[in-house]
Design a protein with these regions (language model features):
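Phosphate/NTP-binding elements of NTP-utilizing enzymes
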Residues: 1-177
Length: 177
């Protein structure tokens, strides 16, 4: 079997092997929907973004066909080199990249079986977040990457008031150094 065929073969992945041990407890807390807000601090290389973007977000989408995800950074032009590849990394690690369609401009990831979306926005243009229209479902997950770069709780609260409507439950992640 050549290397191309080997890559195309389905492989079983143990999700626990992909999660840094420091996030085991958080993983199960999120699974059980025990909280709405998860603020995860850690230095570079702490695996917080890998956990949220690479693993938790795709799993949550596959578990609940009604939710969509919005990923936010303070500056929009940083998305293509940060959070988007982080999520793609997770899809590759879990062996499920073929179930998702990746669009670079504007950045967007679609779960092919249901049409659910991961939408990316920079808050350097906050009006874009207010005009989100989804074909079905609701925004069930919001991820603020580099949370410490946002202006403060008022900015975050304004965004959440625009996004968190019409669903039975939500999860908000904030990752920062």
């Amino acid at each position: 079997m050549n290397s191309h065929e080997n890559r195309k073969r389905k492989r079983k992945v143990n999700i626990a092997d992909l999660i840094a041990p420091s996030f085991d407890e958080v993983f199960f807390d999120v699974e059980a929907h025990r909280h709405t807000f998860y603020m995860l601090a850690g230095g570079r290389g702490s695996a917080k973004s890998s956990f949220v973007g690479g693993i938790r977000i795709p799993l949550s989408m596959m578990e609940d066909p009604d939710i969509h995800v919005v990923v936010l950074r303070k500056v929009g032009n940083t998305i293509k080199n940060s959070v988007l590849p982080q999520i793609v990394w997770g899809l590759e690690q879990m062996g499920i990249l073929d179930r998702f369609r990746i669009k670079m401009s504007p950045p967007e990831i679609t779960y092919k079986p249901t049409g659910q979306k991961i939408l990316f926005f920079g808050l350097d243009d906050p009006a874009k977040v207010k005009s989100i229209k989804l074909p079905f479902g609701y925004v069930g997950i919001v991820w603020f990457e580099e949370l410490d770069q946002f202006s403060g709780m008022e900015e975050i609260r304004n965004v959440l008031q625009s996004l968190l409507r019409g669903g039975p439950s939500y999860q908000v992640f904030g990752t920062y150094n």
